[in-house]
Amino acid sequence: MKLTQLACSSIASGLLLLGCGSDPDESGVNRNHPSGSAGNGPGSLDLGEVSTAPGPIETLQTALPTGFVAATGAKNGGDAGQLRGGWHVVGPLGKLPEPSGMACANVLRVLMRDFATFKHPDFGGPKDPQNAPGLVEPTLGAGRKPTRSGKYPKVAVKLDDWYATLKGVNTAYVVDFWLEPVGQSFVLDSSRFFPLDDVESAEAKQSDDDGQPRNFGFTTELHTSFRYAGGEVFTFRGDDDVFVYVDGKLVVDIGGVHGPTEGTVRIDDLSLTQGRVYTLDLFQAERNPTGSNFRIETTLDFADCGSIVDDVPK
């Protein structure tokens, strides 16, 4: 397996900086900032001595970047006022060139895996119970992946499949998320969250809440890190399963097949050391028609753009 980490430094205001997305355009704001950080906790990153030398030029995307799809909502437009951010499917994992010289800003690179919704035991239908806190262990397992607990054996039969690329089971895609600047936060908010609608899929689409054909049955995997300054908040609202780990410990636990559910973590409550860099790992699963909601809102100052593991079977 090959790990690619896309490094970026922070902006002066201490807000979230994410991603390694599209090239700067007329909507961007170029910024030049110091880089370097250190940490030695169990989930922190030892990135060396702090440097006062200028870091890479970053482009804060204040408008939807070229080639991105704006976050989608209800067909009747009733939730148009809350939609924020957007996404861009870069391409299939394992078929992309190594990134180089990419400017980092509020674009976050993730892995999404497309499953055949009704051919996997964990996808395609309601599970009992619908809310399943404690579905995964409270600490990250090997490879920075969640480990299934012994609870709710019928809710997730093959959870190890969700965040692994497996021939005949799923197809992995590299996707960039644009988090839109909103006040002092950055937000991605979609009530019709279907980034993989246009990828080639062997299965027929299912109808969403508006009767529109959609590609259900997918997971999202994010690995990044942030510099803790004090006062930061990370909020996720969505369906179905969502697990967020900070410093290797579970801080948002929304397991099960259910409607939109929200979890918030105040970083000050985690007993971290200010000035150090800590890992953040997010895992999401959309398992059941007809709804798909996804909202991230944060004031975190991310220290890198995300890391991608090429685990495509050779």
Predicted regions and their residues:
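Extracellular Ig-like/FN3 beta-sandwich strand-entry sites
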Residues: G275-V277
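Short, solvent-exposed beta-strand-to-loop segments that form ligand-recognition rims
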Residues: L250-I267
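Ser/Thr-rich, Pro/Gly/Ala-heavy low-complexity intrinsically disordered linkers and tails
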Residues: L17-T62, T66, A71-T72, D79
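Aromatic-lined ligand-binding clefts that engage carbohydrates, nucleic acids, or primary amines
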Residues: G231-V244, L280
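Short, surface-exposed beta-strand/strand-loop-strand elements in extracellular ectodomains
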Residues: D241-D253
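Short beta-strand-plus-loop segments that form exposed binding edges in beta-rich domains
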Residues: D281-G291
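Sec-dependent bacterial lipoprotein signal peptides
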Residues: M1-L18
